[in-house]
UniProtKB/Swiss-Prot annotation:
Gene3D superfamilies tied to this protein: Nucleic acid-binding proteins (2.40.50.140)
Protein origin, superkingdom: Bacteria
Biological function: Stimulates the DNA unwinding activity of PriA helicase, which does not seem to require single-stranded (ss)DNA-binding by PriB. Activates DNA-dependent ATP hydrolysis catalyzed by PriA. Weakly binds ssDNA. Weakly binds double-stranded (ds)DNA, a partial duplex DNA with a 3' ssDNA overhang, and a forked DNA structure with fully duplex leading and lagging strand arms in vitro.
InterPro entries in the cross-refs: NA-bd_OB-fold, Primosome_PriB/ssb, Prisomal_replication_PriB
Keywords noted in UniProt: DNA replication, DNA-binding, Primosome
Protein name in UniProt: Replication restart protein PriB
Cellular component GO terms held in the UniProt record: pre-primosome complex
Amino acid sequence: MGFTNLVSLAALIEKAFPIRYTPAGIPVLDIILKHESWQEENGQQCLVQLEIPARILGRQAEEWQYRQGDCATVEGFLAQKSRRSLMPMLRIQNIKEYKG
């Protein structure tokens, strides 16, 4: 199946965990993103609030320059958190400072 799986989100960096490395030496950075916005749904304004775990791999994880409390725009895709958990996790492919 070739379904589209693209996510773009402006969010607050709620928490950034220490960088770790896979057994193959790939850097991994796990973060928690917090988002709040007003969206239109069925002709009504709806307050959307969420927290979602996110992961950055490779060079971007090593070059991490953001801090807790910073706002960023992230782009990536959703995947299950782990082999044992079907909970969603945002796999970040691009991150940049949010400039409102």
